[in-house]
Amino acid sequence: MGVFRFISISLAAVSAANAAQILSMPHAQTVPNSYIVMMKDDTSDDDFNHHQSWLQSTHTHNITRRATVQNAGMRHKYNFHKMKGYSGVFDDETIKDIAKDPKVMFVEPDTIISVHGKVDQNNVPSWGLARISSSKPGTQDYTYDSSAGEGITVYSVDTGVDINHEDFEGRAIWGSNQVNDGDDNDRSGHGTHTSGTMVGKEFGIAKKAKLVAVKVLGNDGSGPTSGIVAGINWCVEHARQNGGTNKAVMNMSLGGGSSSALNRAAAQAVEQGMFLSVAAGNDNTDARSSSPASEPSVCTVGASAEDDSRSSFSNWGPSLDLFAPGSNIISARPGGGSQSMSGTSMAAPHVAGLAAYLMALEGISGGAVCDRLKQLGSASISDVGPGTPTNVLINNGGAKGDGKSPKPSPKPSHPSEPQQPTEPQQPAPGEPSTPAPAPMPPTPQHPHTPFPGGDDFDFDGFWKKYFGGEHWRKMFSSFFN
């Protein structure tokens, strides 16, 4: 008995010593009792399946023993490339048990992620398209090659998209809804606006690219990190089954506090060959504090104003790769027409659209795209902010110049009013069903032609809606410049 007790104590000590780290998120708004668990890279499918079976029984045992009504359990499962993991609602004891599994890399509290844009004033000129095909500000035409992104698929990871908007010409499809609200629409307007900049006939850069809507944020422009990781997972798998990840672009005009889980998911997507354009954030602060903007392998985008200055709200710092137009940008509005919005959310889709354009024109893909954008860009931006290693504004390099965009509308066709949050609906218990990858539509034949303010966040509504009732390079690059 004494020997058995000694062995048990020794094993417990070893388990505690090797326990995975339960990360803290002191500067982020966390979702109570909701966590993201990441497994180690060498975790096999069998190991992962065994862990899930163990988790289910352990979670059930712990909530029964504590007689708690909190019984949500696992919500999302992640399994793409080298990344395996899951998210869910668990009690403290279950989280401690999870961390003891030697196959677990880390456990991270689930946090709130938000859009990086806001509806702005109307009656402003549309200038972003013209600026990225000109050597100086103040021009009116957008000159581009007629390939216009044909054969490339762009994933809008956002608030959803009005796929029936006339500017998309039938090239947009609905992909996945990770919000689990049963509403495959864009009630916010944010995702439709960013998508118009990427692929719209009038407002867009890659005018022949296809668009897939992946809803990860709700009507109030916010959502949990766990759902965004699930959205990335879905995009990678869909791209693999439909044309390949080397012909895919993902735009993420969103962000929140630093998240190892979100950065890891973004890095895995890039490693699989996708190009990721990410908004730097709207807090006029160092973007290293935000995810996924702080992930080195993505292309992190700051916002510029019409006079080629950094937009006053735009984040800055070593994480930034490029600048793109982000102030007073006119693009598509749900239900038809247009509206003006500002934010790094508006800058990132300029980069995503131009990435799709160059991938079709030059045959490049993945990590090479951000470097190519830097080569083609112009050193134009003033007041880039402390420690920012770039003042490059994106430019399409003149391309072949055999196409010309129609001049966008001089003002929004609808008044621009702030979108009011809608009372969220209670999701069904358990993990949300993820639709099977949707088939891509045939390519149509065409002629050649912000972080929202924290004080406005409805936490009670959010809770009801979702739960019922190479990092070092950017981090330290400023020290070596």
From Swiss-Prot:
Check the record and name the InterPro entries matching this protein: PCSK9_ProteinaseK-like, Peptidase_S8/S53_dom, Peptidase_S8/S53_dom_sf, Peptidase_S8_Ser-AS, Peptidase_S8_subtilisin-like, Peptidase_S8_subtilisin-rel, S8pro/Inhibitor_I9, S8pro/Inhibitor_I9_sf
A Pfam family: Peptidase_S8
Q: What is its EC number?
A: 3.4.21.-
**Peptidase S8 domain segment(s):** 126-400
In which residue ranges is the amino acid composition biased (Pro residues)? 424-450
In the record, biological process GO terms are:
proteolysis
The entry's localization annotation reads: Secreted
SUPFAM superfamilies attached to this UniProt entry: Protease propeptides/inhibitors, Subtilisin-like
* Signal peptide positions on this chain: 1-19
- CDD domains, sorted: Peptidases_S8_PCSK9_ProteinaseK_like (cd04077)
List keywords of the entry alphabetically: Glycoprotein, Hydrolase, Protease, Secreted, Serine protease, Signal, Virulence, Zymogen
Per the record's keyword annotation, is Transmembrane helix included, yes or no?
no
> Ranges of Polar residues compositional bias?
282-294
Q: Could you say which protein family the record assigns here?
A: Belongs to the peptidase S8 family.
State what protein this is by name: Subtilisin-like protease 1
Organism encoding this protein: Arthroderma gypseum (strain ATCC MYA-4604 / CBS 118893)
